[in-house]
Design a protein with these regions (language model features):
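A conserved beta-strand->alpha-helix junction
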Residues: 32, 36-70
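Short secondary-structure boundary/capping segments
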Residues: 14, 38, 63-67, 113-130, ...
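A phosphate-binding catalytic loop at a beta-strand-loop-alpha-helix junction
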Residues: 1-17
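Short, solvent-exposed loop/turn segments at secondary-structure junctions
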Residues: 2-4, 27-29, 53-56, 107-111, ...
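Active-site adenylate/phosphate-handling loop in enzymes that bind or generate adenylated species
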Residues: 87-161, 210, 215-225
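Catalytic or ion-translocation cores adjacent to nucleophile or general acid/base/metal-coordination motifs
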Residues: 18-37
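A conserved donor-nucleotide-binding helix/loop in the catalytic core
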Residues: 78-95, 193, 204-208
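Adenosyl-5′-phosphate
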Residues: 97, 153-353
């Protein structure tokens, strides 16, 4: 990816020698292929932690994993398991040592504009006293976009009642900014503010708890205050699609790893799964795109997920569940909810409750 590559190539560019890299996921996954090639160019040691159905299912049954789920739950956001097995394995083989500092690229994509919807190219607004009559409609549009993107882990819960509850919480956050008394605020900046205040600070950064669990030191250089302040000032046309970010990385070409030969396109590692997925998609040729994606999430994602995140539940349970889970995080949210509240929303509550 761009962000972790920036970290690694930047360290090399500025003369850091005691650096080692690692990747994880399915064998021959496209990111690992690119990472191996980049690490070789940088002359940094690189290790791959293969995740397959056998080793991950075994790990999910261990006390280590169960304690991780229990002890990293904070009642604010769903527990993230992205690299919990990789760190476990790499520590076990002594590739990662106690004294090591783990550095990743969170959250360069968000900070540099990668999460601003492309439709903002034509719909951005400047909020100020002059257009205060449009304030409500603009805010409604911003919140609607934000809710659709980040609050649909379960299709069944994505209803008007719940969206109204979320809307009220988000509007309170916006009102705290007291926009009416400010000179100018870009509407896309509000969208980024909502994500920063919620998903980024509560969930994405919470993924660092994996390293805390293993007592590993860590750094997040792309959350540097000066870096954040710079990107807050960048105009929309240079943030959409990370335009400025990508152009500068390519122009600087730290350590020579920003040319086309180091870019690998997304592929599904298993040819068999690719063929089966293609066949099933062909059967949905007369179905809507929405219905196809719902089918894919329910029946296929279990087999294509690079980290086997859905394996925390039996396949039979996943395909029999009709609540339209978005991905593995949907299922993890049930774990977090049960730890925090004693039950999750899909379990039958007592009649007197």
């Amino acid at each position: 990816g761009l962000d972790s590559r920036l970290i690694a190539s930047g360290l090399k560019h500025f003369g850091y020698k005691k650096v080692k890299c690692f990747s994880y996921g399915k064998k021959n996954n496209f990111e690992a292929i690119a990472a191996k090639k980049i690490a070789k160019k940088l002359d940094y040691p690189w290790k791959f932690c293969e995740i397959n159905r056998v080793n991950i299912n075994k790990f999910y049954q261990t006390e280590t994993f169960k304690n991780f789920i229990k002890n990293t739950n904070d009642g604010v956001a769903t527990v993230g398991i992205q690299d919990v097995y990789a760190i476990y394995y790499l520590r076990k083989i002594n590739f990662i040592k106690k004294s090591d500092i783990i550095v990743n690229g969170n959250s360069g994509d968000f900070i540099s504009g990668g999460h601003i919807p492309i439709e903002y190219k034509k719909k951005t607004y400047l909020l100020n006293k002059k257009n205060s009559n449009k304030y409500e409609s603009i805010i409604n549009s911003i919140i609607k976009i934000h809710i659709k993107k980040h609050y649909s882990l379960w299709g069944k819960l994505y209803n008007n009642k719940n969206k109204k509850i979320i809307y009220n919480l988000l509007i309170n956050q916006i009102n705290e900014l007291n926009i009416h008394n400010t000179k100018n605020i870009n509407s896309h900046g509000l969208l980024e503010y909502l994500e920063f205040n919620n998903r980024q600070s509560k969930y994405v950064i919470n993924l660092q708890r994996t390293y805390d669990f293993y007592n590993q030191k860590w750094k997040l250089p792309l959350w540097d205050k000066d870096f954040m302040h710079f990107w807050a000032q960048v105009p929309l046309n240079l943030k959409l699609g990370q335009k400025l970010y990508k152009e500068v990385l390519k122009e600087l070409n730290f350590s020579g790893v920003w040319t086309k030969e180091y870019n690998v396109q997304y592929t599904i590692p298993s040819l068999r799964v690719t063929l089966i997925r293609g066949f099933l998609k062909a059967l949905h040729i007369f179905s809507s795109k929405e219905n196809w994606h719902k089918f894919e999430r329910r029946y296929i994602l279990y087999w294509t997920d690079n980290l086997y995140g859905l394996n925390i539940r039996p396949y039979k349970e996943i395909i029999s569940n009709k609540n339209d889970a978005r991905n593995s995080i949907s299922w993890l949210s049930l774990n977090s909810e049960k730890i925090t509240l004693g039950k999750h929303w899909q379990e039958q509550l007592p009649i007197n409750n």
